[in-house]
From Swiss-Prot:
GO terms for biological process: axoneme assembly; cilium assembly. Its main location: other. It is found in: Cell projection, Cilium. This is Dynein axonemal assembly factor 1. It comes from Peromyscus californicus (California mouse).
Amino acid sequence: MHPEVSEQQADGATEPSLEESAGDHSGAGPGVRKEEINETKETCVGPSTTSCQSQKQQSGDSRLECRSGYARNDRDDRGPRMTKEFLQKLCKQHKLYITPALNDTLYLHFKGFDRIENLEEYTGLRCLWLECNGIQRIENLQAQSELRCLFLQVNLLHKIENLEPLQKLDALNLSNNYIKTIENLSCLPVLNTLQMAHNRLETVADIQHLGECLRLCVLDLSHNMLSDPEILSVLESMPCLRVLNLMGNPVTKHIPNYRRTVTVRLKQLTYLDDRPVFPKDRACAEAWARGGYAAEKEERLQWESREHKKITDSLEALAMIKRRAEERKKARDKGETPLPDSEESSSTSPEAQEKPPLGETQEKIELFVKGSFKAKDELFPEKPGGEEELAVVADRTVEEPDLSGSLAQSQIPLVATAEESTSSVAATDGARTEDTEAIALETKERLFIDDLPDLEDVDGMDISIEDQTKETGIPKIQVVSSLSDDSDPELNDSSLPMLEHTPTGSTGILSNIFAVCKDSSKAARVPLTDICKPTATTEVETQGQVFSTTRPQPLIQELGEDGRGENEPNQSLPAQSSEDGDSQLPEATPLGDRAENEAQSSLDLGEPSPRASLEDIEFGLD
């Protein structure tokens, strides 16, 4: 029932057997028996244990190898690779062409790639960005024959290789890698820029290959381990080297007067480390190489004096230009023509002969000043006499308003409506200026009826009209009268629109009717004017009788219908109130009769009859 008891019994059963066996060997001593037992144990245990231990070690090594192999495969599978799908997706992300050959730039930086691959279709690349990856080798760039820029900084490169297909490569950046030797760059015929900062370069032999790069202009060797001053001999063998950066290397401390020495030995250098090499710095460095610090100081003073002189010369040139411009301006203000450049140069030549020669700088200043004036003359050509013409035009514009004002004032006592009544004469006289029209309008607005003369001054006004027309000599009114028997009373009414603003009332009407133009070219040709002239003096005395005896019957009947037949003779008179100064023409005829009489008068103008000429003596003066 109990397993422990059974185990004890089994042990007890085995022990007697051992005792029996020991009893069989009772002839031997106890020590011999112990040794024999130990030997048997060793023979039984020794080989088996060693074989087992070796098997265990082998199995452990195999397990470690299997685990490391699995880890490597997993790492290779987990890392990103340059697959075609990934590259197309990347091109789409950066808004590049899906067609690989059309892309000239490919951005593959910060992607974690460990090798370059699958770029065979990208044959048109000119710039390839592969920085900040895990690339360990330069490879698979055979299709990039048009590549100009290759950026491989911050990778795991140990060697420069496989760059032979890149025959057009211009810039190569291999900074922040583990490169120990510069090599395999002579196959790049147009390589211009090489950046090798933060690498493992140490000796002169590591950079000896740079002497074969004949087109290399920009070289960055900063933050390496270069310590031998003999590297300058390698750099001197580079004919096109312009920019050099050696900061962060021990060699900068091992070369005495580092900057001066490098500047003197590298003749074509224009930029060293963190600042440019100016011509002044190069001259001072060369003077230091010839005569030490004293020569350098003297050379520096000479350069400073030259720079100061150049500044003063430029200021003097500007002052000379300003002075000559002021002289020209004064000459133009005085009305004198400015001297040409040849005379100015001849005038300045005696002064130049008196003064000691200043050298080429003074000649350059003179040439610069002359060139500036020539350019100004070409851009802004000056017209001789232009100011005089402007003055003449200004005088004319000043005189014309005065003349127009005087003419307008002289026309005031004549007839104010000259422009309205004589359109044909105005057309032949020519178009007037806007100033004269404005002044004439102002004078028209200033006319008042109270200022008009009385009817008793008929003879005096006629004389003044003739005198004024002789003085001015410009005809203002051309009279066209139709001496017909039907237009007797309506003649004044038809001429009313022209004469409603006349200053002389009815006498003015008579004077305007028989006014003859003094100009021979514009004289009015009116038939029977000689017959009508004697009656002009007696018109005032017989005017009432003419209207009372010769008034047509239809007019009297029409006015009588309105209830004003008794006062019709008084109303039909032109203007009887001379004392009040209101000389208004009568408007007794209706509009219909006025239109008929105007039409009849226009017909009678063409063919005057002898009967009309006889009756004109009595009725034409109305």
